[in-house]
Amino acid sequence: VLYGMNQIFDLGLTREELMERGVKIGADVPYCIMRGTALAEGIGEKLSKLPPMVKCPVLIAKPQISVSTKFVYENLKLGSDMVHPDIDRLVADIREKDLYKIAADMGNVLETVTIPAYPVIADIKDHMMEHGAVNAMMSGSGPTVFGLFDKEATAVEAYEAMKASGLAKQVYLTSIYNNARK
């Protein structure tokens, strides 16, 4: 909406100015304005542009539950025993455009809170893996799960199986989108 209003009303705001205003609406807004592949840090407002992600089919499934982001962050216990994804290695994987390395190195520490409270999320992840995903992970604080696939046909079969399973109320099949406008 901010991008559109900037165009419609010929405000002349730069992308950076739009991003500064957007973060006041929500942490994800600057990412949507920036477009493309990025490393998000902080609460998601600190963005570093990355090369485009390797194209692949993506299955998205949201169960019929809602998750309180506040609940997840209040119950997150960041101790020395917590395994964090290796961000530097993941960025290198993205630069190499190696889907299998990306899948092996991705992770979400918020799953340690959300999955025990909502086991259906683990069921959805397992279902995707059983149907050919190279990996599946919860998005953000949940409850939505995405799975990366290396073949379109496998992703289509997984999509149909997920819809038939009843695990998710909303199921979408898409692909990585790399339109990073200047």
Locate predicted features.
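Short, small-residue alpha-helix embedded
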Residues: 1-8, 139-149
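Hydrophobic packing within well-folded, soluble alpha/beta domains
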Residues: 1, 5, 22, 121-124, ...
